[in-house]
Amino acid sequence: MSGGLKAEAASFALPGATLVDRVDLTITQGELVAIVGPNGAGKSTLLRMLSGDLRPTSGTVSLDGRALADYPPRALAARRAMLAQHTTVSFPFSVEEIVAMGADIDPRKAAPLFDAALRDVGLDHFRHRDITTLSGGEQQRAHFARILVQLWSGEADAGPGLLLLDEPTSSLDIRHQLDLAETARRCARRGTTVIAILHDLNLAARFADRIIVLSGGRIAADGAPAAVLRHELIADVFDVALTVNTDVAGQPFVLPELADDRRAAAHA
């Protein structure tokens, strides 16, 4: 993905509402980018535009200098994989069958990819389980394995691709949130471009190279975590009181300010 992913004045509007408003951004190969913002900020709409799932109503989104709208569906599927916010399967497919849906190569060549993806998400011992019997978090991990296989099978011919994750940790416990973030970071270090919508600002600060803050369909901030996570910005965008601190390695982290703490500080 030598040319990177680029949005130029990209907007998406419905009658009476603009969900994403003239967004300009460039994301280079191997970056791990977190998109954060309050509910209704336009994060999922922007991610779908960056994936090619939604065509901008104005402006353009391009991959390697070519508009996403100009890619044939199969060619685009070989270049990018997206984990949707919610994926429901009503039929009793096994976990391995779900993962296999991501492959577009000879099944004999795909088998090692299945094994690696299932190990990465911690479901190798569940490969023969009916996916409808799994918990919501386990199902989310199975679908993450599926898109990893899609990504890896496409990269075999097309080179490093694009991995898009829409709130991938929403159903996961702490351990598996960290496991998923580590897997995403390994993908980025191998050259894959990773874009993830996250609500956990500390997870974003710990794993992302760059944080984009979206508010009202527009980019409110874009940069390294330490530059973006500022008290004033968080208060303005999220309408909440948080304290921004820095750990011994210089990484920012945020903690909530409780009402009692604010009252005590005011009278100190």
From Swiss-Prot:
Task: Give the EC number(s) listed in the UniProt record.
Answer: 7.6.2.-
> Would you tell me the protein name for this molecule?
Hemin import ATP-binding protein HmuV
Q: Which family does it belong to?
A: Belongs to the ABC transporter superfamily. Heme (hemin) importer (TC 3.A.1.14.5) family.
The cross-references to SUPFAM superfamilies, in alphabetical order and at most eight, read:
P-loop containing nucleoside triphosphate hydrolases
Subcellular locations according to the entry: Cell inner membrane
**Could you name the domain of life of the organism this protein comes from?**
Bacteria
Q: Which GO terms describe its cellular component?
A: plasma membrane
Which keywords does this Swiss-Prot/TrEMBL entry list?
Answer: ATP-binding, Cell inner membrane, Cell membrane, Membrane, Nucleotide-binding, Translocase, Transport
Provide the species name: Rhodopseudomonas palustris (strain ATCC BAA-98 / CGA009)
Q: Name one Pfam family in it.
A: ABC_tran
Q: Is this entry keyworded Ubl conjugation?
A: no
Q: Which GO terms describe its molecular function?
A: ATP binding; ATP hydrolysis activity
In which broad location class does this protein mainly occur, judging by the first location in its UniProt entry?
membrane
Q: What class of enzyme is it?
A: translocase
Annotated positions binding ATP: G37, P38, N39, G40, A41, G42, K43, S44
Q: Does the keyword Transport apply?
A: yes
Outline the extent of the ABC transporter domain.
Answer: 5-241
Described by its record, this protein's role is as follows: Part of the ABC transporter complex HmuTUV involved in hemin import. Responsible for energy coupling to the transport system.
Tell me the membrane topology, using the record's own terms: Peripheral membrane protein
Matching entries from SMART domains are given as: AAA
Q: How does it assemble?
A: The complex is composed of two ATP-binding proteins (HmuV), two transmembrane proteins (HmuU) and a solute-binding protein (HmuT).
